[in-house]
Regions:
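Phosphate-end processing signature that detects enzymes handling 5′-triphosphorylated RNA
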Residues: 48-419
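Low-complexity, prion-like intrinsically disordered regions of RNA granule-associated mRNA regulation factors
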Residues: 1-52
Length: 419
């Protein structure tokens, strides 16, 4: 029988098979010790040979990841005197999170506006800039201080704004998420503390959002067409660097084969600011990362990556768009495929801003889970360059940040995600 990868297998439509007998107690105990919630059984590939990184997102030491609503909470509900909007937590259908947790995440929703809560765009923009800029400067300083210059790596600061939905989840063994826990988290964030909330930023927006952004918003923002590209991103685990994942950005050659265009490590996050925009349909994330591009590769690494990529078969019928022949998903004990993305994007830009409208099809080989999404990302390229200066000036950065936030606020947050 021909081999079928996990993401192409489907349950049989014939009568269900008889229920197997339960395993003996000794075997059952052994299986429980290797459950997905156990460190021994989690994050392994190839029959348990490779301990994989448990988290694909890397936060730098000192990274601040916090959340706040806009308009902000009053110090206490009693202080609002009717001016604070009526808020509630509402279940939000989100398949990727539901598959992992078995429950719908929660979104903060304004049931009705308070007497003075709607505010103006100028008020919102000023509030975001004043809160974000001091921590941005501090985070950029920490990031540059942590650079360890290496001949084989090119490290860049990368400041982006993304649109999506802030979602909250209750963690096992902790109190349920409530308005009071959100109020406490927002208060902690005001003091510069890292939020203890278990939150996600869901970036999948409707097709209509991408279409309208391309047809109308680009013109209103005075952006020019930059490029349109298709890439396959092959994610590779290297046992010698177990805390990171190698990402090979690949293009399709004329003969249909893949060629490696760029090789990178995971991005490292230094500052994450999530904002629930209560009177908009979408929320806002501002984030500072470092990109780590590998300029030269160790011969063993280079040969392994080329072998893994050349073995890939483009198949539009599988999640992620690529599959590998049986036995070709790993190289010895050291290298193995852990994921693949197929992305198509259009980019528009001016001198200081680059807008990327991307459609992504992802497959995680560790969990056999796939996801398709539409994403809107604003790359603040002018500010990213300025932050690389030895001593960037806050006033000039504020003058660059506020117009971008205003454009995003007015043009990119008014697309409702319909379940």
């Amino acid at each position: 029988m021909a081999y079928l990868p996990p993401h192409k297998r489907h349950p049989s439509s014939t009568a269900s098979a008889p229920t197997p007998n339960p395993p003996p107690p000794s075997l059952s105990s052994s299986l429980r010790s290797l459950s997905l919630s156990s460190p021994r059984g989690r994050g392994r590939v190839g029959g348990g040979r490779h301990p994989l990184p448990s988290n694909k997102i890397i936060h730098a030491a000192g990274c601040i990841s916090r959340w706040s609503p806009l308009p902000p909470f009053f110090p206490s509900p009693e202080d609002s005197d009717g001016e604070e909007p009526t808020l509630r937590l509402e279940p939000f259908p989100c398949d990727p999170i539901e598959r992992k947790t078995g429950a719908k995440p929660l979104a903060l929703v304004a049931s009705s506006p308070g007497q003075g809560s709607s505010g103006s765009t100028a008020t919102a923009v000023t509030a975001i800039a004043e809160r974000f800029l001091p921590d941005l400067l501090a985070a950029a300083k920490r990031a540059k201080a942590s650079y360890a210059p290496k001949e084989e790596e090119l490290v860049k600061l990368n400041l982006v704004a993304r649109v999506g939905k802030v979602l909250f989840q209750t963690q096992p063994g902790r109190s349920p998420v409530s308005l009071e826990t959100l109020r406490q988290a927002a208060k902690a964030g005001e003091g510069g503390s890292k939020s203890q909330l278990h939150k996600s930023f869901y970036t999948n927006v409707p097709n209509e959002c991408l279409d309208d952004m391309e047809q109308s918003v680009v013109k209103r923002m005075a952006l020019e067409f930059d490029s349109s590209k298709e890439h396959y991103h092959v994610k590779v685990f290297d046992k010698h660097h177990s805390d990171s994942t190698i990402s090979c950005k690949c293009t399709v050659e004329e003969d249909g084969s893949l060629a490696i265009h760029k090789v990178e490590w995971n991005k490292v996050r230094h500052l994450v600011e999530d904002i629930s925009c209560l009177f908009k349909d979408l929320d806002l994330r501002l984030m500072l990362c470092t990109k780590r591009i590998l300029k030269t590769l160790d011969p063993e690494v280079e040969n392994a990556l080329k072998s893994l990529v050349s073995s890939a078969v483009i198949d539009p019928d599988v999640k992620g768009g690529l599959r590998w022949p049986l036995g070709k998903e790993s190289i010895g004990e050291r290298f193995s495929i852990v994921g693949v993305w197929h992305t198509n994007y259009k980019a528009f830009r001016n001198e200081t801003l680059r807008l990327k409208l991307r459609h992504g099809d992802r497959f995680d080989h560790q969990t056999s889970a796939g996801e398709v999404s539409n994403e809107v990302t604003f790359k603040l390229i002018g500010m990213s360059r300025r932050l690389e200066d030895v001593d960037p000036e806050e006033t000039s950065l504020k003058e660059m940040l506020e117009p971008v936030v205003q454009m995003v606020w007015d043009n990119a947050l008014n697309y409702k995600i319909v379940p």
